[in-house]
UniProtKB/Swiss-Prot annotation:
Biological classification of the source: Bacteria, Pseudomonadati, Pseudomonadota, Gammaproteobacteria, Cellvibrionales
Gene: trmA
EC number: 2.1.1.-, 2.1.1.35
Protein name in UniProt: tRNA/tmRNA (uracil-C(5))-methyltransferase
Disulfide linkage: none
Catalysis performed (reactions): uridine(54) in tRNA + S-adenosyl-L-methionine = 5-methyluridine(54) in tRNA + S-adenosyl-L-homocysteine + H(+); uridine(341) in tmRNA + S-adenosyl-L-methionine = 5-methyluridine(341) in tmRNA + S-adenosyl-L-homocysteine + H(+)
One of the record's GO cellular component terms: cytosol
Length: 366
């Protein structure tokens, strides 16, 4: 393996603040035409903020090691510590690799390792292989699970071996109340738990005195749904992923949220249902006419809202928009501000030391 140059990433308070200020300068420049109110800024911990990550595995002289690949020449370099990873990830990394290297059946053709951890100190490790997994592997992985006190999943082509659970439980504090979430292996979860808590608290505050009913699109595992539900009479949420819908229903029961209904459908399909263009069997148990929606909450993928969903949002008095891509947010705001005004704007440093910045916007009808 080529010997990489010594990586001397700076995770000091000064370095963190410098990178954040650069992102905020760019954000203000990009949104200058909207005459934004003062931006509320929510900072991340400087280290140990990332709750999930994955590493490729490099094999050399009978030893496996974690590697990443240089962005310049694509060469692998070993990862011996991971300061942005959670403390639990950093604890597990050397312990796991030491045990893997002691057992040929665990090490042989191991291709990738994925970590999922929580603030409640739970952990799930997925081991991905380029070989079929057999009874010998199951026996060794079962011992590994007990020694590390983690959940273990084995994956290879057309094969998934679940030893016990395929999820962990995360506990997030939102304005003084604790919410528990099932986080399933392979499904989307917010990577920065401390910033996620701030995002949930912010969204809850924006809707505290709104009342009426809430429509949420792209609800995922109910991440925002559960804290928001206490501010509304009823909540109707949509999500396309079956795994996420199942988790959202599980999480609503776990947190005793009883004013929520979930429909498994895309935002485009829901728009057709609202307009009476199509009828959906998945909505047979829901009477849309019974809802008195005051607010729509959207947390779309990086592509942002499609034009039809943008126009759907304009029908609501209040729009709460969480964006993981300021570029598509800017495009959507060109449409939304034709009928609504921006009341509050927030920046969440979900991904420190990258150019990414998460945003939150509250818009109200003019």
């Amino acid at each position: 393996m080529p010997q990489p140059q010594q990586h001397t990433a700076d995770y000091s308070s000064a370095a963190y603040e410098a990178q954040l200020q650069q992102k905020l300068i760019r954000l203000n420049q990009d949104f200058a035409s909207f005459n934004l109110p003062e931006i509320s800024v929510f900072r991340s911990p400087e280290k140990h903020f990332r709750m999930r990550t994955e590493f490729r595995i490099w094999h050399e002289r009978g030893t496996a090691m974690y590697v990443m690949f240089s962005q310049t020449d694509k060469r692998p370099y070993p990862i011996r510590e991971f300061p942005i990873g959670s403390e639990r990830i950093n604890q597990l990394m050397p312990e796991l690799m030491a045990l893997v290297n002691r057992h040929e059946c665990l090490r042989h053709k191991l291709f990738q390792v994925e970590f999922l951890t929580s603030l409640s100190n739970q952990a799930l490790i997925t081991l991905v292989y380029h070989k079929p997994l057999d009874e010998e592997w199951i026996s060794a992985a079962t011992d590994l699970r007990k020694q590390l006190n983690v959940e273990i999943i084995g994956r290879s082509r057309k094969q998934k071996i679940l030893l016990e659970r395929d999820h962990i439980i995360e506990c997030l504090k939102v304005n003084g109340r604790e919410y528990r979430y099932q986080q399933v292996e392979g499904s989307f979860t917010q990577p920065n738990a401390r910033v996620c808590e701030q995002m949930l608290s912010w969204a809850q505050e924006q809707t505290r005195h709104t009342g009426g009913d809430l429509l949420e699109l792209y609800c995922g595992n109910g991440n925002f749904t559960l804290p928001l539900a206490q501010n509304f009479d009823r909540v109707l949420a949509t999500e396309i992923s079956k795994t996420s819908v199942d988790s959202a229903l599980y999480n609503s029961r776990l947190n005793q949220v009883e004013n929520l209904q979930i429909a498994r459908m895309s935002s485009e399909e829901f728009t057709q249902a609202m307009d009476g263009v199509r009828e959906f069997n998945r909505l047979k148990h829901i009477s849309l006419n019974d809802y008195r929606f005051s607010t729509i909450f959207v947390d779309p993928p990086r592509a942002g809202l499609d034009p039809a969903t943008c126009h759907l949002a304009q029908r609501f008095d209040n729009i709460v928009y969480i964006s993981c891509n300021p570029e598509t947010l800017k495009d959507n705001l060109q449409t939304l501000t034709q009928t609504h005004q921006i009341c509050t704007f927030a920046a969440f440093d979900q991904f420190p030391y990258t150019h990414h910045l998460e945003c939150g916007v509250l818009l109200q009808r003019r």
